Amino acid sequence: MKKRILAAVLAAVMVFSLAGCAGNKNESKDSKKESGKKTEIQVFIAASLNTVMTELAKEYQKDHPDVKITYNADSSGTLLTQIEEGYECDLFFSAAQKQMDQLEEDGLVVDGTRKNVVNNQVIVVTRKDSKTKVKGLETLKDAKSIALAGGSVPVGKYTRAALISIGKLKKVEDPATITTEEVSKALGGVEISEQDNVSKVLSAVVEGSCEVGTTYYSDTYGYEKDLDILEKVSYDLTGDVIYPIAEVKNDEADKAQKAAAEDFLKFVTSDQSKKVFDSYYFDTNVK
């Protein structure tokens, strides 16, 4: 039996008040129907999608009040591991192709449902009025402290790839394998605080516990008064930052649940949703 994601266990899980809390998996489908409960879908999203997906869920549920959307938001690597370990999931929205590729290799993606949705951009940020000497990636060594996601986190991998591109790190087959300690050494021993996901990187900079950090452009939405963007890192250095979405095979889902997951995926990839993504600083011009 697949494990359920409970808000009390995973702090990153977002359950909308209009959707209620995740129920006990031991509850039978018949009892759910009898009690009038909504059709629930489990949607695993990269942490950087938290804000925009909150907006999209609210929009979707205006026309689909019978569907309950439960989000689990974390780094794409963590979400992949959870799915592989048996956590119940209907849709996976990753911040990188690597994790989705692995899920397909595992045979856990529903054939024909994978779609590229948005592109993002890695940026170097600092808190307003920090008076940092850092101007961008080239001068990261001048920082007093850096918030950096681990290599298994997409933004951490993209940052490492960019540092390789500008000659700050040695070229390796997979940038994700470069440790935080190796990055620190390459940057002259600068203090680096490794973070589990991009949201924690952002928080570390906004709260002032780290002088600078690398995050996504979309993460600055709502923080314009708190942050200064020191550099928008060129795609030539990182490659495209594509976010794919797909249905995940869920043997315990009934027909209504599978239909709801399919319909929500269509909504997320619709022209209506593109306008919302654009407003949250994502690039929807992807193939």
Locate each region found by the language model.
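Positively charged n-region of N-terminal signal peptides that target proteins for export
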Residues: M1-A12
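Short, high-confidence coil segments that cap the C-terminus of an alpha-helix
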Residues: D66, E88-C89, C210
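Central helical "cap/lid" subdomain
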Residues: G107, D111-K115
